Each structure stands twice: as structure tokens, then as C-alpha cells.
Amino acid sequence: MRYAHDECRRQGGKHVTFAPDTVHKLDLTGDGRDDYIVDLSETQCHDRPATYCGTAGCTFDIIVTLKRGGHRNVFSQRVLNHEILPGAGAKTIRFMLHGGYCGLSGGSPCSKTHRITARPFEFKQPK
């Protein structure tokens, strides 16, 4: 959440308004601990509407709770949309991404899936 305030200020915005569902608390790793999805798609940086969203989607973070305490941000990228797939244990998320992540043009979105663990991950565009 601090990122949202800092980025808004860096962009010349005055203040941030968070949507009620900006932070989702749920067990993503299957270990019984609360993990968090932070989705800034409905967050507003007043006077700077494109701060958190653009053609590649909106800022989206996954923060997991570690077994020995503390938290780790395992994913931080812009996504167009996401879907948590059904199933027991660690959750798999389908991410809708800018087409560039699949070698397509930006106007053609693509999907990638990832099973959530405590290991950080990111999607990279092909070279």
C-alpha cells in the first residue's frame, strides 16, 4: 500500500483512494496461512489516472506468509485480469497479460498460469 502512495506522489498526484476490495486475503500456497493479493485496478491517484494501469494492465502483487513468520512479495507485475483456478492445496492462477508476453501484439492478450508457492516468479517477454 505504501507503494501506491509513493508512486502517486512521484507521478505528481495529490492523494490515493483505494477500492474496498484492493486487498484480498486468502490461502494461496495451501499451507493454511493467510496470503494476500493486492490489485490496484480500481485504485485512484487523483490527478494522475494512469498511475497504476496502462495498456499492459494494472499493478498486481501477490504476498505470501512465510512458515517462519514474515511475508514475501512473490509476484509484482501489471496484469489485465486474473482467475484463481479451482482445486485443493496451493492455488493456480491464470493471468491475462499483454500480448507481448506470448510473442503477440499488445492488442492480443494472452494467458499464462502459475501455481503459487513462496518462491518469487515473473513473466518475461520473449526476446
Predicted segments with their positions:
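Beta-propeller blade termini
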Residues: 15-30, 77-92
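Residue-level detector of short, conserved catalytic/binding motifs and their immediate flanks
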Residues: 20-21, 34-36, 60-61, 112
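Sec-exported extracytoplasmic/periplasmic mature domains
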Residues: 9, 41-42, 68
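Beta-propeller blade repeat segments, especially FG-GAP/WD-type strand-to-loop junctions
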Residues: 3-5, 47-74, 108, 113-120
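Acidic, small-residue rich beta-repeat scaffolds with periodic aromatic anchors
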Residues: 1-2, 6-11, 79-127
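Short, conserved, GDST-rich strand-edge loop motifs in beta-rich repeat architectures
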Residues: 42-53, 98-106
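Acidic/hydrophobic-patterned starts of short beta strands in beta-sheet-rich repeat architectures
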Residues: 28-41, 88-98
